[in-house]
């Protein structure tokens, strides 16, 4: 399903006549493969792996079923329409830390690609914090009011 979604995304980008100068991706397999499929379909060079695009470190929640989130993390959770977010499990990256990482991504892209359009293939939580940083929206508001699914296009967002 993921590869099919990536091919559909590439068609959608072509249909919208979006043009990208570079593609960056999380080094994790699924996001990187998605970026590679899209880059190839668009005639772009291979994606560049960028460690700051990796998904949030979930600490003790890593590998646990979503159903366990409330039991383990309550009351430090935020429930949104499609997702429950845990805020402070042991060893996890906090959303303020993730927001700072999102800002680092934007700063890096602005330095490396001034006046260019860059496609980022990343994961949900870091994607939301990049969006929060780019739009100066409070991170809690982004978690509750903003949702994007696999291979959704968010943007373009001008960060110059």
Residue spans of the language-model regions?
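Active-site catalytic microenvironments for nucleophilic, acid-base chemistry
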Residues: 12, 37-41, 108, 112, ...
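Domain-level recognition of soluble alpha/beta enzyme cores
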Residues: 135-160
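Generic beta-sheet signal
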Residues: 116-124
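Active-site-proximal alpha-helix that buttresses catalytic centers in soluble enzyme cores
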Residues: 1-45
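Short, active-site-adjacent cap segments at secondary-structure transitions
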Residues: 30-32, 55-56, 126-128
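Short beta-strand scaffold positions
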Residues: 25-26, 100, 121-122
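Glycine-rich phosphate-binding loop signature in dinucleotide/nucleotide-binding domains
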Residues: 16-19, 109-117
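Phosphate-handling substructures
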Residues: 40-101, 157
């Amino acid at each position: 399903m993921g590869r099919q979604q990536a091919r559909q995304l590439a068609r959608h980008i072509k249909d919208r006549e979006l043009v990208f100068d570079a593609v960056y991706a999380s080094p994790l397999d699924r996001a990187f493969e998605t970026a590679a499929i899209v880059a190839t379909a668009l005639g772009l060079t291979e994606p560049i792996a960028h460690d700051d695009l990796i998904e949030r470190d979930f600490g003790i929640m890593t590998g646990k079923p979503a159903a366990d989130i409330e039991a383990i993390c309550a009351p430090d959770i935020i429930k949104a329409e499609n997702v429950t977010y845990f805020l402070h499990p042991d060893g996890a990256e906090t959303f303020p830390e993730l927001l700072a990482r999102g800002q680092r991504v934007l700063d890096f892209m602005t330095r490396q690609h001034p006046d260019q359009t860059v496609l980022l293939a990343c994961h949900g939580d870091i994607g939301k914090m990049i969006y929060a940083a780019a739009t100066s929206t409070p991170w809690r508001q982004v978690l509750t009011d903003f949702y994007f699914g696999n291979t959704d296009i968010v943007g373009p967002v001008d960060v110059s």
